[in-house]
């Protein structure tokens, strides 16, 4: 934790500086008002404070990630605590562009959820790398299971899962 955290903070600061430069350049070129900016991450980190892995687990610190959308209907100044998943980004972008969302997509349009004031009651979490785990997350609870395989690389799915106490 102590060794990784300063580098993590430095990376966040560097990213913040570069997003600022990007926004400035978009405004200079007159493109900002016709641009959608999405800031997110594929995982969080608990810096190996919960298990031997630092990011690939179903622990909240590893699965709770930022999602900031600016542009289009997303005008900033709004904090929304609804449950979402990265799988929702493709349908959201298609919806924002006025393109029909294929029925085969698993995610939902966040734009549609906001327009219709809908909110789902849970999201599914799947980890299949260093650990093979699955979880269901509600706003209040999480139920998590994992395989006993040493890594998800060996067995990325299983017929048997065990409760994972996070």
For the regions a language model picked out, list residue spans one by one.
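A long, amphipathic alpha-helix that forms part
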Residues: 1-35, 96
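C-terminal, low-complexity/hydrophilic appendages and adjacent surface loops
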Residues: 57-61, 128-166
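Polar, surface-exposed loop/tail segments
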Residues: 33-35, 77-138
């Amino acid at each position: 934790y102590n060794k990784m955290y300063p580098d993590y903070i430095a990376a966040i600061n560097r990213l913040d500086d570069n997003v600022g430069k990007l926004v400035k350049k978009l405004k200079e070129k007159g493109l900002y008002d016709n641009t959608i900016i999405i800031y997110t991450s594929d995982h969080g980190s608990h810096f190996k404070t919960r298990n031997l892995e630092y990011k690939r687990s179903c622990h909240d610190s590893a699965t709770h990630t930022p999602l900031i959308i600016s542009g289009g209907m997303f005008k900033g100044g709004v904090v929304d605590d609804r449950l979402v998943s990265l799988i929702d980004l493709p349908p959201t972008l298609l919806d924002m562009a006025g393109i029909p969302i294929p029925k085969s997509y698993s995610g939902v349009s966040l734009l549609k959820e906001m327009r219709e004031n809908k909110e789902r009651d849970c999201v599914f979490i799947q980890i299949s790398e260093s650990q093979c785990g699955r979880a269901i997350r509600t706003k209040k609870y999480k139920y998590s299971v994992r395989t006993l395989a040493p890594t998800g690389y060996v067995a990325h799915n299983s017929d048997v899962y065990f409760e994972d106490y996070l």
